[in-house]
Amino acid sequence: MTHQTHACHMVNPSPWPLTGALSGLLMTSGLIMWFHFNSTTLLMLGLTTNMLTMYQWWRDVIRESTFQGHHTPNVQKGLRYGMILFIISEVLFFTGFFWAFYHSSLAPTPELGGCWPPTGIHPLNPLEVPLLNTSVLLASGVSITWAHHSLMEGNRNHMLQALFITIALGVYFTLLQASEYYEAPFTISDGVYGSTFFVATGFHGLHVIIGSTFLIVCFFRQLKFHFTSSHHFGFEAAAWYWHFVDVVWLFLYVSIYWWGS
């Protein structure tokens, strides 16, 4: 039997990177098939294999960290750096959308009517559903902080209550955003305004759905006593991600909904 004399986690060979890459190929190919041939078969296959890969890969990570004790303080430090770099990459991702928006709105071309919003576009009222959405996300930021502090203090019931409230607010935000899209007087094909609006807010909405899923997993893990007051990086990463989603929305609200209208 070999003995490990270092604090690093030497990961066992895994099929999930390969199946993840193949499912990504299927999804992107499926998107092209959907756009050009109106066939969703390949896309659904890609999504299904992607979901199965994520479930099994994260199941393995939970097993290694919670039940096998491989996530030493040294490993957790590396995971924290990884999460920070991931969030930085997401910031740069959204920077591109803001750049496109400000490039188009600060110096509107004659094709847009020389004004912003472009001629013929009726923007959404920033003091109606968008303001409610802002309040909902800010409240969820407070409740996720409450959950984090409750976890660090060992108060299990308060942590579960606060986490449930955060998830409920995240789902409520998604439903509000969907209703707003349904009732919007413009579409993604309405020039540069429609493109920048729906791509920026749509990708943010996707991040809210991902963040809500992340928190739901944390909720069930907490029910199974996976987290302790000193060992809960999975939840900590979800909280960081949720705060990032909050901050991006504030920039979206001020830029696109309020100033841009």
Swiss-Prot record:
Keyword Translocase attached: yes
E.C. no: 7.1.1.9
Any Gene Ontology CC annotation: mitochondrial inner membrane
Mitochondrial intermembrane compartment spans: 35-40, 106-128, 184-190, 257-261
Gene Ontology molecular functions: cytochrome-c oxidase activity
One annotated GO biological process: respiratory chain complex IV assembly
Major enzyme class: translocase
Compartments in which it is found: Mitochondrion inner membrane
Catalytic activity of the protein: 4 Fe(II)-[cytochrome c] + O2 + 8 H(+)(in) = 4 Fe(III)-[cytochrome c] + 2 H2O + 4 H(+)(out)
Mitochondrial matrix-side positions: 1-15, 67-72, 153-155, 224-232
Cross-referenced SUPFAM superfamilies: Cytochrome c oxidase subunit III-like
Keywords: Membrane, Mitochondrion, Mitochondrion inner membrane, Translocase, Transmembrane, Transmembrane helix
Broad class of the protein's primary localization: mitochondrion
Topology in membrane: Multi-pass membrane protein
Similarity section: Belongs to the cytochrome c oxidase subunit 3 family.
Role according to the record: Component of the cytochrome c oxidase, the last enzyme in the mitochondrial electron transport chain which drives oxidative phosphorylation. The respiratory chain contains 3 multisubunit complexes succinate dehydrogenase (complex II, CII), ubiquinol-cytochrome c oxidoreductase (cytochrome b-c1 complex, complex III, CIII) and cytochrome c oxidase (complex IV, CIV), that cooperate to transfer electrons derived from NADH and succinate to molecular oxygen, creating an electrochemical gradient over the inner membrane that drives transmembrane transport and the ATP synthase.
Assembly mode: Component of the cytochrome c oxidase (complex IV, CIV), a multisubunit enzyme composed of 14 subunits. The complex is composed of a catalytic core of 3 subunits MT-CO1, MT-CO2 and MT-CO3, encoded in the mitochondrial DNA, and 11 supernumerary subunits COX4I, COX5A, COX5B, COX6A, COX6B, COX6C, COX7A, COX7B, COX7C, COX8 and NDUFA4, which are encoded in the nuclear genome.
Name this protein carries in UniProt: Cytochrome c oxidase subunit 3
Gene source species: Gazella saudiya
